[in-house]
Amino acid sequence: MEQCLGQLKEKVKLNEIKSISFSGHMHGATCIDKDHKVIRPCILWNDTRSRQECNDIMNDKSVMDIAGNIAMPGFTAPKVLWLKNNEFENFELIHKVLLPKDYLRFYLTGEFFSDLSDASGTYWLDIEKRNWSNKLLEASFMNISQMPNICEGTDQTGVIKKDIAEKYDLNINCKVFGGAGDLSLIHISEPTRPLD
């Protein structure tokens, strides 16, 4: 955070920023405990250690209808199931699972939110209902209380906490919005070009 805001401070007055939003790599499992401390380093999107856990989740073929996809090692749910199978002492401590950008949001606001684009890459989202699926959560021995709230990318999810505003000289009224996963934003930010 210090590096990012330090670079931004060279271009703008931080206390004049009125709103912040995020993008970040999708699928990462940032697990925090009841004291809101990170339990272990985030398992990143490109980590493939959870292949067996994908097979375990896919034993019930109906999960594909809910998630709209097959379970892949890059997704969050298989990573967390891997924790249960291989680092049970860490798995037992999980209070919330946040995606990387959503951990930054929590740090700045104290609020637990994830936008729909990032939530869709967890393998816990019912894509039709646009909400967490109890069935998908149960497949990795999780429950809805361990999930952040779901929001649209354009929804306001909080304001900067007072201690954070003071620490970084940010506007105490600075609004924080949902944002989106990196792949989703690539699709909407890439200029369209005529076909040759």
Predicted regions and their residues:
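Carbohydrate-associated surface elements
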Residues: D47
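Short acidic-glycine loop/turn motifs at beta-strand connectors
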Residues: D33-D35, L108-E111, R193
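Single conserved hydrophobic/aromatic residue that forms the stacking wall/gate
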Residues: H187-D196
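N-terminal glycine/serine-rich phosphate-binding loop of ATP-dependent small-molecule kinases
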Residues: M1-P41, D65, L93, A165-E166, ...
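Pocket-flanking alpha-helical
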Residues: Q52-D56, S189
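Gly/Ser/Thr-rich active-site cleft segment
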Residues: F22, M64-G181
